[in-house]
Amino acid sequence: MIRVKVQVFLSLRNVIGQREVDLEIQNAKVRSVLSELHNRYGDRIQPPLIDSKTKEVNPYYLMLVNGRDLRNLPDRLDGELKEGDVVQLFPPAAGG
């Protein structure tokens, strides 16, 4: 089991109630972080973190692992995490 830090921004802070949360996960994969967040916060996170069709991170979200865009990492959601890694989640934002 490893511990990772998840930092959330914008509207996700309202859902989670804080800027960051420490998670202990058994399977040290990025996908496990999203599963644990879903287990804790469920349908309060909208849109869902995982796209139901592609099984990848919903394209509306930006997800960084240790400051690197998940979309540019070779294993994406199946990438291995290590103790102390930092995952950052940015929800969709609109502006004009």
Which role does the model predict for each range below?
Residues 1-95:
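Ubiquitin-like/PB1-type beta-grasp interaction modules and other compact soluble beta-rich domains
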